[in-house]
């Protein structure tokens, strides 16, 4: 999976360098996926040859700004530095259309594509206690609280290597963060299984336990516990037996008497404190090299 994903990413970079169109890039990715790398190289050579006709070397050597940014890091590199809503074109989403996403252009250099936000936006406390289809397709308002959608998160995280960042805030406005390298999920056929790498940050490692586990919701029990974790803890998440983080749980806004069913990050606040504000966001791992 990773080898194919990396090949598709390199092919797209080459296409951008030589000014290939979106349809030409899509043809390259389709050929690579279906018939192999050799056929893809032949198609790519043909397209590049067409682009080089009647062009001087000085023109070809100029960097080409991608007309179809694939994530918020691309948007930042294209010169847009304000946080807010943007349109992107993930590579594996081309046949479906564009995605509207919220870009965080301020945190740690910017370029983050936000995939989840919780806050006090007037929705019911159980707003995130939804069935599989809602988590599959996404819900909410990207300017407020929302879940981007597991299909979309899959499309994003399988086009290149990403890290994920969790930004957490308590009622006293104290903040913590956690970063995990090499974050990606599998598709629906594989129950959106979670994959993450090494942890860093000051929030404590409350997501690492969920690595390798499938997504569960109120109507789909894919955890490893004898009970139904999503029903018990009132959210959609990569539960195992059951959780050390529950960022899609009930919005309980601080301390609560119930056990572990709020927006929990155990390593920082334990199981009786529901965080009033959290964000989950992703950025390409190589951004730290090419983006700064």
UniProtKB/Swiss-Prot annotation:
GO cellular component labels: extracellular space
GO function terms (MF aspect): carbohydrate binding; metal ion binding
Glycan-linked positions: 173, 198, 214
Protein name: Techylectin-5A
Cellular compartments annotated: Secreted
Domain Fibrinogen C-terminal stretches: 63-286
Location of Pyrrolidone carboxylic acid modifications: 24
UniProt source species: Tachypleus tridentatus
């Amino acid at each position: 999976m990773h080898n194919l994903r990396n090949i598709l990413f390199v092919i797209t970079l080459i296409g951008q360098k030589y000014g290939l169109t979106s349809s030409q890039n899509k043809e390259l990715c389709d050929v690579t996926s279906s018939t192999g790398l050799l056929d893809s190289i032949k198609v790519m050579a043909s397209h590049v040859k067409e682009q080089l006709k009647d062009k001087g070397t000085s023109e070809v050597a100029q960097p080409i700004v991608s007309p179809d940014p694939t994530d918020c890091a691309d948007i930042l590199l294209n010169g847009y530095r304000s946080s807010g809503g943007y349109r992107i074109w993930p590579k594996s989403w081309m046949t479906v259309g564009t995605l509207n996403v919220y870009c965080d252009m301020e945190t740690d250099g910017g370029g983050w594509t936000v995939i989840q936000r919780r806050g006090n936006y007037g929705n019911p406390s159980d707003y995130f206690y939804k069935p599989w289809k809602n988590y599959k397709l996404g819900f909410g308002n990207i300017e407020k609280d929302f879940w981007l959608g597991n299909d979309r998160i899959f499309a994003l995280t399988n086009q290149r290597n990403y890290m994920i960042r969790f930004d957490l805030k308590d009622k006293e406005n104290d903040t913590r963060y956690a970063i995990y390298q090499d974050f990606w999920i599998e598709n629906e056929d594989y129950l959106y299984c979670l994959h993450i790498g090494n942890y860093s940050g000051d929030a404590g490692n409350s997501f690492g336990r969920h690595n390798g586990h499938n997504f569960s919701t109120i109507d789909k029990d894919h955890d490893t516990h004898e009970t139904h974790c999503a029903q018990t803890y009132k959210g959609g998440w990569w539960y195992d037996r059951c959780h050390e983080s529950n960022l899609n749980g009930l919005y309980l806004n601080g301390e609560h008497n119930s056990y572990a069913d709020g927006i929990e990050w155990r390593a920082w606040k334990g199981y009786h404190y529901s965080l009033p504000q959290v964000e989950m966001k992703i950025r390409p791992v190589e951004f730290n090299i090419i983006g700064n």
